Each structure stands twice: as structure tokens, then as C-alpha cells.
Amino acid sequence: MASDSGGPGVLSASERDRQYCELCGKMENLLRCGRCRSSFYCCKEHQRQDWKKHKLVCQGGEAPRAQPAPAQPRVAPPPGGAPGAARAGGAARRGDSAAASRVPGPEDAAQARSGPGPAEPGSEDPPLSRSPGPERASLCPAGGGPGEALSPGGGLRPNGQTKPLPALKLALEYIVPCMNKHGICVVDDFLGRETGQQIGDEVRALHDTGKFTDGQLVSQKSDSSKDIRGDQITWIEGKEPGCETIGLLMSSMDDLIRHCSGKLGNYRINGRTKAMVACYPGNGTGYVRHVDNPNGDGRCVTCIYYLNKDWDAKVSGGILRIFPEGKAQFADIEPKFDRLLFFWSDRRNPHEVQPAYATRYAITVWYFDADERARAKVKYLTGEKGVRVELKPNSVSKDV
């Protein structure tokens, strides 16, 4: 791999973005395939599990990636003016989710690579070598100069309006242009304080009655899962006793997505997962950088609703940091109460949850692209094996 300058062993930011475990999407402490040197895995076990598929495309030398990056809009730098004021169609007010960036410097260039050569053809044990440290560098490594800030934030009440926008207007005039331009969209004050409080009460009741279990990985054959993700989760359909307001939240999300139908990239969204209700217990756990859908399992949009009143990230941490592909910038999203977040689920948006030092609740739903979902043969990334819930076209839309 080489940078645009052509120097040997120098990685561009976009090349670093494409380094993730081919099986689970993890982006830290990766091992490189010793044969093609263009695929990565978080452990030997995950490479073995993926070898049957990978060996069909694994070739010696610097083979290019099998699939190019999707030709979708990326997160763009903010327009001229005040730093951090990224707007979608001029409709949204600035969010309070500040983003920071650093520009990688020459010191981040990778050294000449070393490691085992290509494996003998037909080898049953796939070759693997440790990915050099500099190639695992963050998009925003220490030592670089400060860059432009990026704020994907926005509000449910753009331009200082005091009345919430109807769902159709919010979807078409804010969410669609914001997603297609930036790939990230934040809506504040989504359902209102009273409804948000009711959802929080239902989630805490689930937690208090022992409904949560440790977040699962694709493979549980090692003891390192808690080092990767420290949350506890439960899956909710929305019809369970005591989860009526969570069901209302899911219906409200569905309404927004339905209004966006056919306008979010090239996707044809026709279903979603159940809701994953997650809790970080506040003991300093987080979730390392990863990609929700690195292997085309059908998920195209990640939608997260936060439930944390009076959250102060300076004290409690818990920020969701998104590293948009190909950008020397990252977007920091604070998990604030009644905040709704959308972003593309594929490798355009690697992200991490930074350590949380107070109890942190969130509800996540993933929406499916019909065509990609139909092509997906292995359904293992969602934890519920891609449970599909139909979006009923005759659902009565609600203003939110």
C-alpha cells in the first residue's frame, strides 16, 4: 500500500479506513493476511472462519480490495464561516455535538513492512501476520496540527422554531439532505421530555429485572469479548408488556424512514431489526472502533436514540466518536437525552463508544436495504441474526 505521494509503505487515510476484521468489523490490533496482505482479522480464529470465502479472492502480492468503497456522499468539511457549522440545506441549527480533527503528519507514515511471505497454494491454515503499528493509526493521530471542525448536529426545531416539525417535513427537508451530504444526522428533542422519560422508565425496568445480557460478538470462542465491548443488551420487538413506549419510539423511527423512502442514497429500505436496548454500566467500559456492517449483511442505516438526562461528557465520557471514511476528521456525538442519530451502517462510518463513567442507555435499530439483504447469505452480525420486521406501507404517519 502506498500514499498518494507514491512513497513505499506510506498509507493514505482512506487506506487506513479500510482496515477492519473481515468477519466482525473490529478495527483495533489487527492481523494482516500474510498471503494477499490486503485483508485483516482481529484474531487467528476469525481468519480461519472466513478462510473458505477469503481464499477464493486471496492472491499473493499487493492485491486490491475486492470491492471498492460505495459511491455515496461522504461527510463534508463545514462551509466557510464559523468552525463546526455544518448545515444540511440550510435547514438545521448547529448541534452541540462538537467534532474535532487532526491532520496526520509525516511521522504517521508506515515503516517498510515485514512478515511471513505468501502461503503455499492449497494451504488449509490461512497465513496471518501482525499489522504494523503505524498502519493502525487513528484518522486523528496525536502530533498532527489542528484541522477544521465538523459538526453533523442539528435539531428537530430548525431556525429557532418553537413548534416541532411534522415527520414528513423533518424527513424530507432535513434528514434526507443531511444524510446524503454528510452521512450522519442528529435530531434533538425528538419525542419530547415526557415521552422520553417514559421510554427511560421502561428501559430501566428491563435492566432492574435482569433482562439484559452481555453484548455478544460474532465469535465467543475467546475470553476477550469484554475488552472489545462492555455493554449489556436486550432485544425488544415493541409489543412486550411494559415496552409500549419503546414500541412508540420504534414506530416513530419507522415513520421517518418511510418518509425518506427512495431518497436515502440508492437504498430501497423495506425492513429493520428489532430494537437493541443497550446499557453501559458506568464502570469505564466502552466499545472499540468497529464497523456495523463490513460484509454486506443488508444493514444500511443505523438509528440510535439516547436516554441520558443531564449527560456531561466531560465528566461521564460515553461519547460516540465516528471516523468518516477518507476524512481527517471525527464527529463526536454526546449521548444526550431525547437525541436521535442516523448514520450509514457500512464502512463509511467506523465508530467507537468511548469509556462511560455513568450509566449510559441507548436504543439502536438497523434498517435493511432490500437488495443487499436479499444477497446476504450469512446472517450473523446483528446478534439476532438479522431479525426482519416489515415496515407496513399503510401505517398512519405521526407528527413527532
From Swiss-Prot:
Database matches in PROSITE patterns: FE2OG_OXY (PS51471), ZF_MYND_1 (PS01360), ZF_MYND_2 (PS50865)
EC number assigned by the record: 1.14.11.29
Induction / repression: Induced by growth factors in cultured vascular smooth muscle. Up-regulated in proliferating myoblasts induced to form differentiated myotubes.
Zn finger limits (MYND-type): 21-58
All copies of domain Fe2OG dioxygenase, residue ranges: 271-369
Protein name: Egl nine homolog 1
Binding sites annotated in the UniProt record for Fe cation: H290, D292, H351
A single BP term in Gene Ontology: negative regulation of hypoxia-inducible factor-1alpha signaling pathway
Presence of keyword Ribonucleoprotein: no
Region span, Beta(2)beta(3) 'finger-like' loop: 218-228
Cofactor binding mode and count: Binds 1 Fe(2+) ion per subunit.
Domain topic, free-text comment: The beta(2)beta(3) 'finger-like' loop domain is important for substrate (HIFs' CODD/NODD) selectivity.
Provenance organism: Mus musculus (Mouse)
